[in-house]
Structures are given as structure tokens and as C-alpha cells.
Design a protein with these regions (language model features):
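Conserved N-terminal phosphate-binding loop of PLP-dependent enzymes in the Aspartate aminotransferase
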Residues: 1-192
């Protein structure tokens, strides 16, 4: 749950792919579109993949996905057939999402609010490890988190995700304000 590869690993991976002629495909379905505090999470590592998969954030809840290809691939009209691709409503939603991300500075907000949450969450001794970037945060505990999640949702009305039995996942909307982050921390503290 929310394990961030090191820059060294990612750069060595890029190097190995380049040296062997292997295509580097990065899955940015969850981490892309500002979630990590940069538009794409791999931008923290100063690398360029050959293919990037995107979804989730691209449509802000509307079902949409995409594949971004590097210039090394020559697109050929009619090469890929689909019975569902190019949905006009989905494409309109994706364009609107891009406008809102830019106009409301949501990537910058995800970084600022995420950095604040990461720093504050590290102060809780009950948490074994705090990891993540931007508004993609994993909290690992020594004990299973089932009861903690139940108290958060039923007592404090805070929905969280989970990974395995011991990791609480925080993936709030990119528009989460600093005030809302502080409110989350206050509610989180109550259930620990």
C-alpha cells in the first residue's frame, strides 16, 4: 500500500530498459493527474517512460482511460480498433477536468496539503510508517486496521481505504483544503 520506488531504482530501470531495447510502461492510473503533487508521479524521478497508462483522475469519476505514447511510436490511423473508444462525453469530461486542475491549481494544492499531512502524521507514535507523496498517503500500523477504519467511518464520518490488513490508505480529493486536512487530523486523533 502506497510504496514509493526510489529515484535511483526508477533511473536504473529507465537505463536498463534503454540499454536492452525494452519498452518502459508506467501505470499512472492512480498516481497521475496531480495525485502525487506532480502531474505524473514519475516526474519526481526525472525519467521519461515510453508508455503511460492513465485513468481515474482523467475523468474525475466519469469512466475514461488513456494510453500516452512517446514519439518513438508512430501512430497509424486505423491501427487500433475499438467498439467503445472516443466517447464524446468522456472526452468532454476529460477536457473539463484538465481545465479545473489548471484553474484551481490542484496539482500544487495536492503537494502543499499532502506535504502538511505527511509531516503531521509522522508525529503520531501509533503509526509504524507514514509514506506517500501529495494526496496519496499510506499509514502502516503494527496491528490490523479493521477496527480503526470502522471507528473512522462510523464515529468520525471519515472514509479511508485499506491495503492488506495493516495499511490505511488516504486518497482524498485534490481540492482538499488545509482546513479540511486539519479537521481530518483532529478526527483521526480521536480514534487512535
Amino acid at each position: 500500500g502506497i510504496k514509493i520506488p526510489t529515484t535511483e531504482f526508477m533511473q536504473e530501470l529507465r537505463k536498463a530498459c534503454s540499454e536492452t531495447g525494452t519498452i518502459l510502461i508506467l501505470d499512472e492510473i492512480q498516481s497521475g493527474y496531480g495525485r502525487s503533487g506532480k502531474f505524473f508521479a514519475h516526474q519526481y524521478n526525472d525519467i521519461k517512460p515510453d508508455i503511460i497508462t492513465v485513468a481515474k483522475g482523467i475523468g474525475n469519476g466519469f469512466p475514461m482511460a488513456g494510453v500516452l505514447i512517446s514519439p518513438m511510436f508512430k501512430p497509424v490511423y486505423g491501427q487500433l480498433g475499438t467498439t467503445f473508444g472516443g466517447n464524446h462525453l468522456a472526452c468532454s469530461a476529460a477536457l473539463a477536468v484538465m481545465d479545473v486542475i489548471e484553474q484551481e491549481n490542484l496539482v500544487e494544492n495536492a503537494k502543499a496539503v499532502g506535504d502538511y499531512l505527511l509531516e503531521e502524521l509522522k508525529k503520531f507514535p501509533q503509526i509504524k510508517e507514514v509514506r506517500g507523496r501529495g494526496l496519496m498517503i499510506g499509514l502502516e500500523f503494527e496491528e490490523p486496521i479493521k477496527e480503526l477504519r470502522s471507528r473512522l467511518i462510523y464515529d468520525e464520518h471519515v472514509f479511508t481505504g485499506a491495503s492488506g490488513t495493516n495499511v490505511l490508505r488516504l486518497l482524498p480529493p485534490l481540492c482538499l483544503s488545509m482546513e479540511e486536512a486539519k479537521e481530518f487530523l483532529a478526527r483521526f486523533k480521536k480514534v487512535l
